[in-house]
């Protein structure tokens, strides 16, 4: 019986011995193509699997509604976000995790830096600055498309998914500011970027950021997600850890969510409203300062990145 194409490809890859590699210089173009091919297949599988899980979750949620669950209730909002996060992150964790485990022997080829003297605070304005400039790029492209082709205005995704009540606003804040950064850094900067690092740090950062931007699934968020992904990738490579990027990602999502949904997150009065308003004000200050500091921060990051101190061989 003739083997299927998938079985033939699987057999071919099982025969590859990466344990013999001692440095990145040992990787041949065919090896790099093979790694990228595997990641491409993993990406396709994760997208298809995501659609299947999403449809299943929709039917499950519809079953709860038919059973009497109010679509305006907090429980519905919690279930909606939970199911959405499961369908979004689970397929990518499984697909990219499989590639990560397969090429785990290549992890010892990762560049280890002796000098970790990056100034951590410059990443905060860099994060907000790149996000703001990414939004400006989207606005400019939208204007050009409207001018040349008469297309409609690109929908603001944050407005489209805006919570309708205080309770749903709290759920949105929890999932957007705390859940999403953890899973996204695990997927894109740990599983994906680490799998790509054998082909070079810079290509790994750019490709992982590109996939991170595309994974948002809409044009409105692509530019700033891509630029933000570059910052998170720089941090993951520079510190050999996803924790700093995860913290910065959390800070960014927290302030963006509070600023965007300030109205929905307030209204109960007292200390809570004061804290939310203060956080929104602080976020606006950081965003405005970062916006004008963007060119200087970009230059500082570029200079720092090109002066990495590599360990010398004995």
Sequence positions of predicted segments:
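Membrane-interface segments at the starts/ends of alpha-helical transmembrane spans
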Residues: 68-84, 159-167, 268-292
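Conserved small/polar residues in nucleotide/adenosyl-binding loops
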Residues: 306-312
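Function-critical hydrophobic alpha-helical transmembrane segments in multi-pass membrane proteins
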Residues: 133, 158-218, 222, 227
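Alpha-helical transmembrane segments in multi-pass membrane proteins
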Residues: 46-102
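Functionally important transmembrane alpha-helices
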Residues: 51-52, 214, 221-287
